[in-house]
Amino acid sequence: VSNSCAILAWLVGLLLFFSSTVFAAPPQFSQVTPATPLTFPHDFGAHPNFRTEWWYATGWLETPDKRPLGFQITFFRSATEHDADNPSRFAPHQLIIAHAALSDPGVGRLLHDQKTARAGFGLAYAKEGNTEVKLDQWRLVRADNGEYRALIQARDFTFELSLTPSQAPMPQGDGGYSRKGPRPEQASYYYSEPQLRVAGSVVRNGKASKVSGTAWLDHEWSTSVLNPDAAGWDWAGINLDDGSALMAFQIRGKGGAKLWAHAALRDKSGAVKHFAPDEVRFTPQRTWRSPRTNATYPVAMQIRTGASTWELTPLQNDQELDSRQSTGAVYWEGAVTVQRDGQTAGRGYLELTGYFKPLKL
């Protein structure tokens, strides 16, 4: 999941617009299958033969005066229905979309920005072979040593961050084949890079602050959408204080019931425990209503994975991101602290989609 599972649903409106102008045969996209293992470093890069893809980094930062901040950087690549053999440089074969957000309790609400462009002309791209995505002056680049460099010059803030791995990538699901529903095609290729060490600077109101912290990066690509009865999803990526990492998600139906779920807990030695759909439960503990959209979000969430109980508490209530100018979605994406069985355990991010209105798949 992450920017969880089928963000393709958010892009359907854009894709339908571009496909409506096409008279040639639409391209045939690759399908996700369980028999294809992830291969690094190739799979750090883009996969243009699949319909949709995203790179998603979130984390907690700390300023020199110990002030906590949360950050989100997401780049989407989405293939249109244009004929791939069309030689025109102006044919919009791929769209690049980016979101960035800063969660600062001193501001009292989420600061966020978004961009959209068709790939091409060196202004927007997602390259194959290694992570290198760009949209105007926004970029996320992975070096051969695994370090990521992010530069985001947003409307209300600037991020200049390095994200350095401390662990190997964490393939989700069955070796990177991540089920999102009961049907085998309801799946994505998906891996995470938890426990990234972060250093750099954040600029607010023209003033730069040094920051350090810990981040989580997800990379996911797919072609098929979710179950047609799906309305949204809840997802969490948690860096635990002992070096472990927890990923959990559920897909919700239009009536609110769980359609699918999965969780994975990797300890610091690399051993992974997977949890089946019936072993994962998301239970809202407290809600917050947006004064802008009137959407109500379960911003404090309890997650059960097997015998363990995780309590997620938001850094601040107002972490709603309105991306109707790019992906068409309104969602809640927030920094959270985490307790495990009543004890302080870590920090991470919680994503809540489909609460403003059900996703149109």
Language-model features: locations:
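Structured soluble/peripheral alpha/beta segments that form catalytic or ligand/cofactor-binding pockets
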Residues: 25-361
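Bacterial N-terminal signal peptides
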Residues: 8-21
